[in-house]
Amino acid sequence: MEAADFFAHTKENVDQLYAKLVEIAAAIRNPWLRQLVESVVLDAEIVPRLKRAPAAKSMHHAFFGGLLEHVISLCGLCRVVLSHYPEADPDLLITGAILHDIGKLEELSYERSIGYTDEGQLLGHIMIEYEFVTKRIDSIEGFPAALKALVQHMLIAHHGKYEFGSPKLPMFREALMLHYLDDLDSKMGAVRAALESDKGEGNWTAYSGALERRILRTDGFLSGTKTELEPQMNSDKHR
């Protein structure tokens, strides 16, 4: 039996998710970026970990296979937004989407349950992936220095703010897009988790630490079901 048999895991087929990831990587037209991404997603030592890893311990996609589900979802968002902003570089944005959380393979432990590794506690995934991706880039002879700097910047800036752990703010178009789309997918993942939980009162979910609020179950609300919450809901914001 797998650990995922006893803990929460993605409802998607991880093999299909991975096949989609390989397809997305192969579609990258920039040869340097495609070689970089494929050096990661086709690495035989990385693949099984990529299929198992969560995207977080508790904030979003915090289940086995969550990282892969998040990356594929984020790539889908990128494609939609790229159609609206055709001036953006699709290869650069997709590269950032695929690699932006790759450090979580080392930051998190996920063999038996989900937690943090010692390295993860000390360094965090941004530092881990910066070093990891930099080494991969340096192993590709002739990789353009300017392109290397853009990829590195997207990794360290994707949290968007200093207080959220990014040492630099996003400073070019694709870096900004990656930050906001990553945040959107993370928030929607947290909303989904809250709505799928059977905890809460009436039309409201239990308090979500990731979202810092309760979420309204709009289907029940629109059907005319009226509920009253305990006074404690008003004190949630003070938690």
Region roles according to the model:
Residues 179, 197, 201-209, 213-227:
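N-terminal intrinsically disordered, cationic/polar leader segments
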Residues 58, 69, 80-198:
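Divalent metal-dependent catalytic cores for phosphoryl transfer on phosphate-bearing substrates
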Residues 228, 232-239:
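Short, low-complexity, charge-dense intrinsically disordered segments
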Residues 22-30, 41-46, 160, 186, ...:
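Generic surface-pattern signal
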